[in-house]
């Protein structure tokens, strides 16, 4: 990349020379000086942008990059129709097809070029992933452009922090996400899920027996977002947001404005490739105005939560236990964060904590509509153990431990369906890192500034890791028959809230029993929550939340896709934002299941 530095120096000298000429023509008064400087910058900036593009997108990857010797995808080369798929198809889909079509498998790394020609290094093998995510995790950071995109909605919390700052923040927050604490949240998850089912049932016309074919059509994308927002509020912040009961909830409407894909969002993203972030955010565009309003609503709510929790802690200090373990209480009692940093942490968990799980729940309902036999089998298992699937009155509700045992150990098919949904429909299909220094990955030299692609959509459907049916939705891949006996298979246990063994909680199950015939031979074969120091801190929370929401919905309702053309996934429009959110919603027909 030294050549790029030389170009920058040459352009700077050219700008200084141009500035001197302007100064000579217009004099040295204050106004003339500013005018000459402005003119010089306006003249130089396009040349800087164009020169940077020519070097980074054409000269460097074509003639100088040390990564040229790696396997290149697609096989047709950069200037081909295949490259157009990077902007016309959902993120990660083209890369997944390219990797699975390679003849010389397995490979550790592959190189491709973006639509504009910029070089990308795709991390493929478990060994390469382990080095990037664990061994050298802090050698790779989120690029500035991605940080500027995300921080508007998430704040500069643990998700975007880097280096020592990230280590400090993660350590301070870890207590709130220990599985020991997550176990105590099962009843909270179940209560919100039961409320969700009750409100959905009210959407169905009354006046006929519930055993009839009375149905209603709902947008599961919107409802899933409302449910997960209420869960993160109650379980993470100690306060519900009334999103399930009230479609006009200010917080829900704010996130709808922020996450709803639009042409304006795409246009602003393109502008950020060329112009400084502050300039783009300052532009008087409708999208910017909506973003500013939404963020203001969210920040105000976070300030309110912090203020109320501080007052509650003060009241409790007089001889009352105040050792709450929700995210906000842990962060406050730790004393590490300022109020502004606390707002950033709450914004991080509100945005990342509800949008990703809502996306997973949406895709789960979709695939169960597409495979009704899986939906029916799952419903049968759930109702066998939960005859009153909308929950219990508080006076009759089982203990946290009883609920945890039931969800984790008595519902094996629920567990594997959830695992397969997270594998097949990774909510975040692709993320990017940038090498902060000259480094190596499996002895391959990687220059500073190289863009690294970590793609759950690619890894989770890699046929070299998951077998020839990697691109099929098959929950049974996680189950392993014993002597061909399917009943024995159903006894396989996999604790969805925690992947660590607890020998006192259930019979020991080997990894082979869990993984099945097409077992994923490495933990790094499943990239949904990443791995290592930068893995998702809230993955246990998300897994349990997702499982309980899905169990409640499937136990209470039968789902069908309203528009049958969408049963072909290629007809579904998917956001090109951070998550694989379905654009325009997903209409499903809901029929209540009678309680027997």
Curated annotation (Swiss-Prot):
Species of origin: Gibberella moniliformis (strain M3125 / FGSC 7600)
GO molecular function annotation: heme binding; iron ion binding; monooxygenase activity; oxidoreductase activity, acting on paired donors, with incorporation or reduction of molecular oxygen
Coiled coil (UniProt feature): none
Annotated spans, Disordered: 476-512
GO biological process: fumonisin biosynthetic process
Biased composition (Basic and acidic residues): 484-503
Entry-linked PANTHER family: CYTOCHROME P450, P450, PUTATIVE (EUROFUNG)-RELATED
Pathway: Secondary metabolite biosynthesis
Induction: Induced by fumonisin B1.
Disrupted-gene phenotype: Increases the production of fumonisin B1. Causes growth inhibition in both solid and liquid media. Increases the production of ceramide intermediates including 3-ketosphinganine, sphinganine and phytosphingosine in comparison to the control.
Gene3D superfamilies to which the protein is assigned, alphabetical: Cytochrome P450
Keyword Heme (UniProt): yes
Gene that encodes the chain: FUM15
Name of the featured protein: Cytochrome P450 monooxygenase FUM15
Enzyme Commission number: 1.-.-.-
Family: Belongs to the cytochrome P450 family.
Annotated positions binding heme: 536
Alphabetic keyword roster: Endoplasmic reticulum, Heme, Iron, Metal-binding, Monooxygenase, Oxidoreductase
Function description: Cytochrome P450 monooxygenase; part of the gene cluster that mediates the biosynthesis of fumonisins B1 (FB1), B2 (FB2), B3 (FB3), and B4 (FB4), which are carcinogenic mycotoxins. Also plays a role in self-protection from FB1 toxicity, probably through derivatization of FB1, and may contribute to ceramide biosynthesis.
Compartments where located: Endoplasmic reticulum
Superkingdom of source: Eukaryota
Predominant place of localization: endoplasmic reticulum
One Pfam assignment: p450
Cofactor dependency: heme
